[in-house]
Amino acid sequence: MAWGFSDIPEVVVDYVRGVFAAANDKVSRAMDVYPSMHEESLDHLLIMELTAAPPAFFANERIGVAIESHWLGGRWMWHRWEIADMAFFVILRRHGHLQIRKVALLQTKRLYSREIPVPELERADFEIGIGRIADRTDPSRPLSTRRQFTFDGGCVYGAIHAGDHQMDAIDAYFDDRGIPVYYGFYNPTWLPYSA
């Protein structure tokens, strides 16, 4: 019998939502403490939190569930474009046999504070991906300099806006493959926020 989403017991859905909510909370709290944290570090923190969630067994439903996460950042997935930063798999088994596997691709963007300029990105930033960080030569502030970070409704998510080439590539990927790519937005636990 083929399983659909409606066949997944509510207790399992609640468990998976809880694991993702706890991981999201951990990442948001990291932005509270380290407001200038790089997006890639936030990606790794999210993956670490999800990976740390052990598989769970629901005795009444006789179902085991595991969540697997994989970082994809920097990989060319579509015509030399990075389409997603990470992939998640939610796997349900009964008596050791696969019942259903759900896959989600996630493209993440972080909210930039008023004090951190949103970097001007070039096409190569998306084509090369994370490897582009090694090319940076821009000056940085001394670590001993005190800084203020303010997040409010006027802040923007870096590298995402209507008509953006990366967003166009993600849309084309979906049209061709039929695999949706979701957007994850990193921000502090509340707005406005200042640290």
Please annotate each region the language model reported.
Residues A66-E82, I91-R93:
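Active-site metal-binding core of divalent-cation-utilizing nuclease and nuclease-like domains
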Residues Y34, A87-V90:
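A structural/positional concept
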Residues R93-R101:
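Short, solvent-exposed loop/turn segments that connect beta-strands within catalytic domains
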Residues P55, L111-A195:
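Acidic, metal/cofactor-coordinating or nucleic-acid-engaging core segments within structured domains
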Residues V11-H70:
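Acidic-basic catalytic patches of nuclease active cores, encompassing PD-(D/E)XK
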Residues W81-D85, R101:
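Short connector loops at helix/strand junctions that flank enzyme active sites
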Residues M86, A104-R110:
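Conserved catalytic cores of phosphodiester-cleaving nucleases, focusing on short active-site segments
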Residues M1-S6:
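Nuclease-adjacent, charged terminal/linker segments that flank catalytic cores
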